[in-house]
Amino acid sequence: LHVSGKGLNSPKQRPQLIKVKATMYDLQGKEVWKKAASAHLPSDSTVNCFEALSPDTTKSFMLRLEAVSELNNEILSTNTYFLWSNESSKELASVDIAKVDVNIMHKPTIQVVLTNTSDTPAMMIRLNLCGTDGEQILPVKYSDNYFHLLPGERKTISINWKPFDARGTNPQLKISGYNVKEIVK
């Protein structure tokens, strides 16, 4: 989903009936606007799901767009956008630091559960698997990377990599974000 109100479906995906949810939050994570619609997305298509948004441009907002399958209620896509004018972009610099708890479980893959335990949105969170030498381990496949957590929101990320690629060092997971102090686990 895009901020323009358009949804797209790739040529490889079957046609889908989706629920589209658009929710706008202020920079403190308080919901200020919400809209929902249903749309049919044929394969290899772009469809207008709702009218493009034109928020108050004197303030900054976070816009969360979700596409949910009508068939099984599975979340198909989540996108978060920041909307601001040049004048209001200064508001981002004054956002409080968010606290994110991290729980790592080792299964065949690493499962990381991140929870925003603060009253502030945790913005632009990024995970980075590194060796104890500080160098990035590559290649690594993350189920999601570079995302936002609203207050109280929890997200589970799967991380796949080959131990050989750690160059004989122990892996460390670095979690950082715009307003999240770096965490190393």
Positions of the model-derived regions?
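Solvent-exposed, conformationally flexible loop/turn segments
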Residues: 42-47, 105-107, 151-154
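Sterically constrained small-residue positions within well-ordered secondary structures
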Residues: 11-13, 54-56, 103, 118, ...
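Low-complexity, acidic Ser/Thr/Pro/Gly-rich terminal tails and inter-domain linkers that flank the onset
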Residues: 2-4, 81-107
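Terminal connector regions
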Residues: 40, 46-94, 138, 156-185
